[in-house]
Amino acid sequence: MPRPIQATIDLQALRHNLAQMKSAAPDALVWAVVKANAYGHGLERVLQGLRAADGLALLDLADAERVRQLGWRGPILLLEGAFETRDLEWCSRLNLWHVVHCEAQIDMLAVHKTHQAHRVFLKMNTGMNRLGFTPQAFRAAWTRLNALPQVDEISLMSHFSDADGDKGISAAMAIFQEFTHDLSGERSLCNSAAVLRHAKDAKVRVDWVRPGIALYGSSPDYPAHSPAHWALKPVMSLNAAIIAVQHLQVGDTVGYGSAFVADRPMRIGVVACGYADGYPRHAPTGTPVCVDGVRSRTVGRVSMDMITVDITDLPHADRGSEVTLWGLPTKTSMPSAGVSIDEVASAAGTVGYELMSALAARVPVTVLDSP
């Protein structure tokens, strides 16, 4: 019998979230971001749920080739652009758009011999200080690209560093507009947080938006807003079963380091999921779970293959009971709305992005899709 743990990918939830992004940024085209193997969900698994996207944005040439082989004929954008000159031949062969964020990438284009001119997104650094030309160097980069016969179309982009917080996007927007107002080309600025919080403004959403984490049902500005606030549905759920029950007396301890001490008689469920499955090792006592659809909590430290949960006040919970680590229970008859991955991530001092992308290969995955 397989170990009783399972991840579920819900394509209807993915379609719903994509529709929410389109509604939040009316008239804009959508790059669905599928980097990091679609945030841990699996490129092959999610592609059918993203057919309504206008383009796919990712990092790796190998991933671009995979989605072409899977039948995607729409635009594909390489978010970090080319790393070597020979990558440009792949871009031509696979008909890829690619980001240009430094002079070295323009140098590569200038010496590249191609029969098909390239479509590029020229990136400005408006304060994130990761990739992109400084505002002062941006026009010279655009002018140089515009003079190359290897380049057919230049679009303009940046990435907001504070769209999810109080600082907001106004300073970055002002910089971008000041240095691009008379340059031709489509624009792309908005990540998930900017789409949900700011994209009703046509000057912000411009031509293309690039939602990532929100597509998969996580709130980009948690804890300020929950996924439910943005009407997002969890795409990934992680469920496992209780494989043993322990009865504790006052003073008994649980797990490595005796980190949890019972202050009353307790029943503890041992769950077939640990940090080797992708559950966060640093999740403390009190991290929320659902047991047979009823909210409870973890107790003690997370082990490699197991976690322990409090079932003292759940008299029907026993060996075989389903524990929802994040997302929704597998049985729709269960009473709970589940556990947001953002709640678990916040308790563990991380973000939903990390939990999704860290799902271990040993966890079996089931794809749900309604006709």
Which residues does each predicted region cover?
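A charged N-terminal "starter" segment
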Residues: M1-W97, D152, P364-P371
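Active-site loop/helix belt of alpha/beta enzymes
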Residues: P2-R3, A24, A36-Q48, S92-L94, ...
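Residue-level signal for inorganic ion chemistry
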Residues: L14, V67, L156, I242, ...
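Conserved beta-strand positions in the central sheet of alpha/beta enzyme cores
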Residues: A57-L58, L77-E80, V99-V100, M157, ...
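Short, acidic/turn-prone active-site loops that include or flank metal/cofactor-
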Residues: L61-A62, E80-E84, E103-I106, N125-T126, ...
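A structural signal for short, hydrophobic beta-strand segments that form beta-sheets
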Residues: E80, E153, I242, T298-V299
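C-terminal accessory subdomain/extension
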Residues: H247-P371
